[in-house]
A protein has these predicted regions:
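Short aromatic/hydrophobic "clamp" motif used to bind/position activated sugar donors
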Residues: 89
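Donor-binding/catalytic cores of nucleotide-activated saccharide
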Residues: 73, 94-200, 215-224
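Short, well-formed alpha-helical segments that are part of the catalytic scaffolds
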Residues: 16-30
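A conserved acidic beta->alpha catalytic loop
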Residues: 34, 42-52, 69
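Cell-envelope/extracellular polymer assembly enzymes that use nucleotide-activated donors
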Residues: 6-9, 37, 188
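Membrane-interface aromatic/basic loop that binds lipid-linked glycans or pyrophosphate carriers
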Residues: 271-332
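Glycine-rich, basic loop-to-helix element that forms the pyrophosphate-binding segment
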Residues: 68-84, 97, 105
């Protein structure tokens, strides 16, 4: 008798995504791997998404629904983590899609190699660009250890630190929870999660389709809430320096790049905005400018650092030119 394949728990936080939710669920139902459960965590939706969750559960017995007051994506993910029954779990956002062979490939490789997690690049798409583009592409499948995986994440070499699309062995994830009430929760938790892994499967092809919305956290301007990323970056650097000290420089480099991006966002609004945050960023860049000359640092980041050390207006102009070139390269 053939041994039953391990159960995969799919966690989907749901909040006011009625137009996209059925497509998301259907991408799970289309999996060639059939031993899964789908946990829809309705986070206090007001657009009918919660009712749609219930309808979908009636249609498919593998779907379980949990309704809760609105507490944010992190809170909803944490509820899902508490309810998982599978050996593995997968994080999927309710407006995104998963490729049909993903679970087959993830389970096969993790079971064969004893890996604790599987990561893939994202394909990012929108209504305006349905063909999308691949974020952090790389060439070949690899089995990496903890340090190699974290290094690739820190340097954005083929994988990032987003939690959407992460496939994880449940017992290895353990008691980790996403921080509730702040932005950039993925940045805050994913390095802690990977630090618990002995081996990680990294796939070259995207198996997660990430939908970009105008006004999303990734694309909207800087507000007071966004400035928490300065603390998150500092906290992650501290954690890595203590846990995997060989990667301290790479962690500081990610913090440097994150701070530069945040400064650009502040200046997009007003050069006089958030003076304390600007001073904090400039101080960090001044103290860590040598990182931009490391062999793994990107030339574009070195130029941003050097121009900022001259003056903010030059930095802003150069950064904006780089964004314009990247945008038009993608569109071509």
């Amino acid at each position: 008798m053939e041994e039953r394949k391990p159960l995969v728990s799919v966690i989907v936080p749901v909040y006011n995504v009625y137009p996209y939710l059925r497509d998301c669920v259907q991408s799970v139902q289309a999996q060639s791997y059939q031993n899964w459960e789908l946990l829809l965590v309705d986070d206090g939706s007001t657009d009918g998404s919660g009712e749609l969750c219930d309808e979908l559960a009636v249609e498919d017995g593998r779907i379980r629904v949990f309704h809760k007051p609105n507490g944010g994506q992190s809170d909803a993910r944490n509820v899902g983590l508490q309810q998982t029954q599978g050996k593995y779990f997968y994080l999927l956002d309710s407006d995104d899609l998963i490729r049909s062979t993903a679970f087959d490939q993830f389970v096969e490789r993790c079971e064969a190699d004893g890996a604790d997690a599987a990561l893939t690049p994202l394909k990012m798409f929108s209504t305006e660009q349905p063909e999308g583009r691949t974020e952090n592409p790389h060439q070949i499948p690899e089995l990496l250890n903890r340090e190699e995986t974290m290094s690739r994440m820190l340097l954005h070499q083929g994988i990032g630190h987003g939690a959407g699309g992460v496939f994880f062995r449940r017992e290895v994830w353990g008691d980790l929870q996403f921080p509730v009430g702040i932005l950039y929760e993925d940045y805050a938790v994913m390095y802690r999660a990977i630090a618990r892994c002995a081996k990680v499967e990294v796939f070259p092809e995207p198996m997660y389709d990430y939908r970009i919305h105008t006004g999303s956290t990734m694309k909207s301007g800087i507000t007071e809430k966004n400035l928490v990323i300065l603390d998150v970056g500092e906290d992650v650097t501290r954690f890595i320096a203590e846990t995997v000290p060989v990667l301290k420089a790479e962690a500081e480099y990610l913090q440097l790049v994150t701070y530069l991006k945040t400064l650009k966002g502040i200046l997009d609004g007003d050069f006089a905005s958030y003076p304390e945050a600007q001073a904090r960023i400039c101080r960090f860049v001044q103290e860590h400018r040598a990182l931009a000359r490391r062999p793994w640092a990107k030339r574009a980041d070195r130029i941003k650092v050097e121009t900022l050390l001259i003056n903010k207006r030059l930095f802003y102009a150069v950064y904006g030119l780089g964004e314009w070139k990247n945008k038009h390269t993608v569109e071509k």
